[in-house]
């Protein structure tokens, strides 16, 4: 709770001390950093790591033993991630699987942060380049199913101005990438329970007539969902009217982050409201692939960033 209050105070300071001038264009990205925490945190948690066959116990401050043994990142690994963040050059990045601001700062030293306050080491949040006015919005705690999975984190850019836009960082339940949400699998049931929470947030922004985006790790191929109940058909129902959505990955070829990967479709997405999509720079959707040498030698992540560019004035429907 103290950490969350500090983040909110920092966002107020960032808003108060900024020039409030919106840049003409923003580069927005999402990146799951795969169990990213400071080396000191990982060392402290390793002795009491959780075995693979241990029963699942909600949110707690622990790491799986395979993570403790296989994802201990060296200074060189962290430096490679930092280089990749610099190459990405995004103004706003939705982050997943990051312990919090202290860890995120190792990769994004020139950014401010909004993060969820979940006790577990996997948190959602945002990195915001210094100088971009923002406020940390409320956490979407209901999305976590009583903190069994990850919370949503809201970010408000250019708050209190005609150019205000709202972003939600999500990391939905894994284990139901292509199955029906009506499947009897427990993971599909949990994902289905998250769906109305997400839809309520979308509908609330639409009813408030604010441009908005949902971005992050959906743990699901939204472009190839099976028939029946699905994430996309539920959230993209244009009810209310401003809840009509655009998947920025539509029509784009899939790329793996490195040669050793064999995935066949995106699960990381940037979803825009129809209003915000009016500012989408044509052909700006992309994926920042890992350099081959870093992919081979360094412990990067099983995800690499997905990004877009937005013309701010068009995205919010006001004159520049």
Predicted stretch roles:
Residues 19-107, 119, 294, 311-319:
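N-terminal, active-site-proximal structural segment of metallo-dependent hydrolase catalytic domains
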Residues 169-187:
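Active-site His/acidic residue clusters
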Residues 28-33, 63-71, 81-104, 155, ...:
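Active-site beta-strand/loop signature of hydrolases that rely on acidic residues for catalysis
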Residues 200-213, 219-320:
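Metal-dependent phosphoester-hydrolase catalytic domains
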Residues 33-37, 98-102, 118-122, 132-134, ...:
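Solvent-exposed loop/turn segments at secondary-structure junctions
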Residues 92, 97-173:
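Structured beta-strand-rich core segments of catalytic domains in phosphoester-bond hydrolases
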Residues 77-81, 94, 100-103, 123, ...:
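Stable alpha-helical elements in mature extracytoplasmic
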């Amino acid at each position: 709770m103290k950490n969350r209050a500090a983040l909110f105070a920092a966002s107020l300071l960032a808003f108060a001390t900024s020039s409030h001038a919106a840049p003409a264009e923003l580069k927005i990205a999402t990146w799951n950093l795969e169990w990213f925490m400071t080396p000191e945190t990982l060392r402290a948690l390793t002795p009491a790591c959780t075995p693979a066959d241990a029963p699942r116990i909600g949110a707690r401050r622990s790491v799986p033993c395979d993570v403790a043994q296989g994802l201990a990142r060296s200074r060189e690994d962290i430096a490679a991630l930092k280089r990749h963040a610099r190459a990405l050059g995004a103004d706003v990045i939705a982050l997943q699987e990051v312990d919090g601001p202290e860890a995120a700062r190792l990769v994004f030293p020139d950014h401010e942060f909004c993060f969820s306050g979940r006790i577990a080491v996997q948190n959602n949040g945002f990195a915001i380049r210094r100088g971009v006015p923002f406020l940390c919005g409320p956490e979407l705690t209901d999305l976590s199913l009583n903190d069994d999975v990850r919370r949503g984190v809201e970010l408000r850019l250019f708050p209190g101005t005609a150019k205000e836009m709202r972003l939600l960082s999500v990391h939905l339940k894994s284990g139901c990438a292509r199955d029906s949400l009506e499947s009897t699998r427990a993971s599909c049931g949990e994902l289905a329970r998250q769906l109305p929470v997400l839809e309520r947030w979308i509908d609330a922004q639409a009813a408030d007539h604010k441009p908005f985006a949902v971005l992050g790790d959906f743990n699901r191929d939204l472009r190839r969902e099976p028939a029946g109940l699905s994430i996309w058909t539920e959230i993209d129902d244009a009810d209310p009217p401003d809840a009509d959505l655009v998947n920025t990955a539509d029509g784009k070829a899939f790329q793996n982050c490195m040669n050793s990967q064999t995935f066949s479709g995106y699960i990381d997405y940037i979803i825009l409201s129809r209003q915000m999509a009016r500012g989408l720079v044509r052909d700006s959707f992309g994926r920042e692939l890992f350099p081959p040498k870093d992919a081979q030698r360094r412990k990067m992540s099983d995800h690499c960033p997905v990004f877009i560019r937005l013309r701010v004035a068009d995205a919010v429907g006001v004159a520049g």
